[in-house]
């Protein structure tokens, strides 16, 4: 952007958000996909919608799903690191920035970092994966919502989880905990056991010892962030990677069945997770959090949604009066700021 573009814009910020929300609702239900959007674009959009008295979770509710092109690219590299040509950084790791990937694979990228052009680049980069590693693409399209991730996890004895650490895309062979205790007791993310570890070592540990072991790295309990579009693949992929390739299929199956069959152990893991989460909450000071930063601290009650819709439909004078109808003080403050601006 430049000064001219900003000063001659057709919309105010309030009007722009209204147009975005209207367009997204018209497209819905849809899969909202970008490149590195889960941790950047989506977060920015959610916070702006939240401050704008709109639905912050529009892109992953009411039948909508999310996926991230970067997640798909990383998973594709974990399966086959020759899927695309890449640059390498000073640490020798593959560079997965959109512009770099496009340029290295013969895609014109001189207009990169323009929003519309980046969307076009994302399409072209992902088309290569769609054509050359379709199983990864199809797997990604099956985990675009929390419900899909949970259903997949419940129905599979074990599977390959793709994670990205310190510039490396890795595959982990995991089995979800017993279904009653599969979700984190606080955050509701899927919890799975890493089959590189022998589960019997942990079965009889007292709770305090179990918590100590769970805090060590590498972790034997892996968190699958169900609402962040993880890419989950068939167990064959991780079983061919180290360290799982050194184990027999029978050994891995035995470990998976031991986890699924030990309801008591899974219950104690769940209890340990709850206590660890509470300990972190107790040591965290949230007294200085601003209303804008509180989006994940306290969700807006559903009964406020019709009030927000009515507020947007009202004229500016009536908007001031309607602020008294909100029970959530954050919404009152946001409304005052919108009127002032």
Regions found by a protein language model. Give the residues of each.
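Metal-dependent phosphoesterase core characteristic of DEDDh/y 3'-5' exonuclease domains
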Residues: 1-5, 24-133, 140, 311-341
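Conserved DEDDh/DEDDy metal-dependent 3′-5′ exonuclease domain
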Residues: 2-81, 239-252, 260-293, 300-303
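Phenylalanine-focused residue identity feature
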Residues: 11-14, 24, 32, 40, ...
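Glutamate identity and glutamate-enriched acidic tracts
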Residues: 19-21, 43, 48, 87-90, ...
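A general structural signal for short secondary-structure junctions and capping/turn motifs
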Residues: 23-24, 113, 179-184
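Arginine residue identity/basic-tract feature
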Residues: 26, 46, 54, 66, ...
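Acidic two-metal-ion nuclease catalytic site recognized across multiple nuclease folds
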Residues: 128-263
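Non-catalytic terminal regions of proteins
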Residues: 203, 209-341
